[in-house]
Amino acid sequence: MAASQTIADSKRAFHQAFPHVIAPLYRRLADELLVELHLLSHQSRFEANELFSVGLCTVFDTFIKGYRPEAQTDALFRALCSSNGFDAAKLRKTYASLVEQAKGKDPESLKDWLSSHALKEGSHYSRLMAVGLMSLLKAAAADATDSDTEAIVKQSKELAEGLGLPTDRVEKDLTLFGSNSERMDQAVELVEETIAAEKRKKERRLEEQAQRTSS
């Protein structure tokens, strides 16, 4: 990506790649990720490593739940990535591969495996890396009793330093991610309930009209 590209340029490229109306509930997600990826793409010390790939996909998938039409979500992700010089297909491939590899690993082997994906010394940290770490820990603990969010955040913090991640920021970023995820789930549930209620009202009106017509 050209160093001279501005946020306005990135937004223009995004809207060209994704010329669809985005519902207000999801517009903020798109705007925030677009700006975040733009800033990272201009950070000379940033490297789109494995933890970043997993984290970006996790954040997008978490906050895109309930998006309609669902068929547009892949195109939305591709547009967010391509408008900032990232390869969506490569990110998705890395995400799927690492999540699959993490499954079933015991704590010790997981720690050794994660060390091979540590942030290089002097590299720029992104909150998406913390989310990526948490996502892999969740995949490994899928069948364990301690797979709740608090335990995962604690485990992420314990592993952070050994992976070159700032411990305090990891805890803060994951706590914020968790609270935002809960709020998004509640918002999506409310929207779906509202849509369902409107659908029921419409069906009742149609039934009443049909009864009046037949009587």
From Swiss-Prot:
InterPro entries on file: Thf1
UniProt GO BP: photosystem II assembly
Q: Name one GO cellular component term.
A: plasma membrane-derived thylakoid photosystem II
Residue spans making up a coiled coil are 182-213
**Which terms are listed as keywords in the entry?**
Coiled coil
Described purpose of this protein according to its UniProt entry: May be involved in photosynthetic membrane biogenesis.
Q: Which PANTHER family match?
A: PROTEIN THYLAKOID FORMATION 1, CHLOROPLASTIC
Give the family, as the similarity comment puts it. Belongs to the THF1 family.
What protein name is recorded for this chain?
Answer: Protein Thf1
Q: Which organism is it from?
A: Synechococcus sp. (strain CC9605)
